[in-house]
Regions:
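A short beta-strand motif characteristic of beta-propeller blades
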Residues: 23-29, 82-89, 126-140, 190-196, ...
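An edge-strand/N-cap motif at the start of beta-rich repeat modules
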Residues: 1-26
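Short loop/turn segments immediately following the C-termini of beta-strands
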Residues: 9-10, 52-54, 112, 122, ...
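Short, conserved, GDST-rich strand-edge loop motifs in beta-rich repeat architectures
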Residues: 50-68, 158-172, 217-221
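A short loop-to-beta-strand structural motif that recurs across blades of beta-propeller domains
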Residues: 13-15, 62-65, 71-74, 116-119, ...
Length: 297
């Protein structure tokens, strides 16, 4: 049965939701480390997710921070058994969107407060930084925070978001080849291209087979709290708002690059059809939903 898998940081759960929204069940409980990104290995019947880790202590006037290095990646089987840690807690700082190239047996993810784009083998080995946007106290500048990621496996290119401060209109979407140029490092690549800047607060990405990049934005309206798309190949196009009115849009998933499922921190999953222009709420699971994926369980 095809279901949507969605992470809930408030309830510390992974929900499995029927495609028609008629049912929702708990697939994994006790997700105490603030889960965020999720990807499904259909062939091997595994589910991977990132954890942001424990949030920093203290009082917050806005959203909590995660400057402590305690991020991790976990994996579980489709039946909810054999849960184990793939990338140990503290290997990186804050796990955000997660994707994969299963043909190359690689996981890719963003480390927000760690200011980097990372990848590793499916078993957690061979961790390497592909992009590093800052170091030390530069993490206090949210313009350096990497969040969403997509991989073009054919062209060997990574796309990622740097969201900027909340509602500040300083977000960016960038891309670079997977392979770091000879003689360069992840922190001085010299081949990074900024596709769009001055975005409200871009979050998760999906690269469609037709050459369009689709992304969520949790920033201020009217351009924020939206789903957007723009062509990135063979040439760069203009960004277009496809759907509005979210309560901080986060996750995005699709099976056909036409119908998209979108989660938000308000607890809603909406389904939008880009060809027909339809847009409706599928289900509301209560705050706070993050990453979203599709699985044949």
């Amino acid at each position: 049965m095809t279901e949507l898998l969605v992470l809930n940081v408030r309830q510390r759960l992974m929900h499995a939701v029927a495609f028609d929204g008629s049912t929702a069940r708990t697939l994994v409980a006790d997700l105490a480390e603030m889960p965020d990104g999720i990807v499904v290995d259909q062939q091997n019947r595994h589910i991977y997710w990132t954890n942001m880790g424990k949030r920093d202590s203290g009082e917050f006037s806005g959203e909590p921070t995660f400057f402590t290095r305690n991020g991790s990646i976990e994996r579980i089987d489709f039946d909810g058994r054999n849960r184990h840690t793939v990338v140990p807690r503290g290997t990186f700082t804050t796990g955000k969107q997660l994707t994969a190239d299963f043909s190359e047996k690689k996981l890719y993810w963003c480390d927000r407060e760690g200011m980097q784009v990372l990848r590793c083998d499916l078993d957690g080995s061979n961790i390497e930084a592909l992009v590093v946007t800052g170091a030390g106290d530069e993490t206090l500048d949210a313009r350096n925070h990497c969040v969403g990621i997509a991989v073009d496996t054919d062209e060997r290119i990574i796309y990622w978001t740097q969201k900027g401060p909340p509602d500040a209109g300083q977000g960016r979407i960038l891309r670079a080849p997977i392979d770091i140029p000879r003689g360069r490092t992840a922190s001085d690549r010299g081949d990074i291209e900024t596709l769009w800047d001055a975005l409200p607060e871009p979050i998760d990405l999906h690269l469609a087979s037709d050459g369009n990049l689709v992304w969520t934005d949790r920033g201020a309206q009217p351009r924020g709290n939206t789903v957007n798309r723009a062509r990135v190949k063979p040439q760069l196009g203009y960004a277009q708002v496809c759907s509005r009115g979210y309560h901080e849009a986060i996750g995005v998933a699709t099976t056909d690059d036409v119908t998209y499922y979108v989660s938000d921190l308000g607890g809603s999953i909406r389904v939008i059809n880009l060809s027909e222009g339809t847009d409706r709420e599928l289900i509301n699971l209560g705050p706070s939903l993050t990453g979203l994926a599709v699985a044949e369980l």
